[in-house]
Amino acid sequence: TNAPTPETLNYLREGHIDFGIVSTPFPERPDIQMIPVREIEDVFVAGRRFFSYKNRTLDFQKLESLPLIFLEKNTSSRSYMDEFLAGNGVYVQPEFELATSDMIVQFVRRNLGVGCVMRDFARDYVESGLLFELRFNKMIPKRQFCVVRNTKMPIAPAAEKLLEIMELDAAVATV
């Protein structure tokens, strides 16, 4: 399934899936096992319409005056960014709230606003010069992709083996 973190966690709790891949942060529960597998970074990207901001160091307050493109509110990524910005005294009202990060990148490519996405979603466009990342005077803290499973539910043998392999890979990657 391809769903926001809260929805994926519900599927897991209800036994509809053996495991899921979600992004932090999310509420920890004793019955949910979490295996961090990859670090992720949130960035703000823009196209030529916002070229005057390229290579400038901005304050997060500037976001309040820009047309923003965010994920919908029912995602952990959106909640994380809203909380991070609020912690810095910044409150935004996005022009567009979209279902996927791929859609955000496409809206940004068409110069409809400044998008907030995980770096990987915009990497190819940034490397090709079609988009650029806004720079800020403070870093946005990194997050994690995690594999999660419900320890109170039985798991299919194939899913169990895949999780074992992922745990080994994650352990090797941190050595």
Show the residue positions of the predicted features:
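Central regulatory/effector-binding core of bacterial HTH transcription factors
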Residues: 1-29, 98
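Hydrophobic residues within well-ordered alpha-helices
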Residues: 12-13, 63, 106-112, 147
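A ligand-binding cleft/hinge motif common to bilobed small-molecule-binding domains
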Residues: 24-30, 83, 87, 102-133
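Flexible hinge/capping segments at coil-to-helix
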Residues: 31-68
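Short beta-strand->loop
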Residues: 33-43, 128-141
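Secondary-structure junction motif
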Residues: 52-54, 67-88, 155-159, 163, ...
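A local structural motif
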Residues: 86-96
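A late-sequence structural motif
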Residues: 132-174
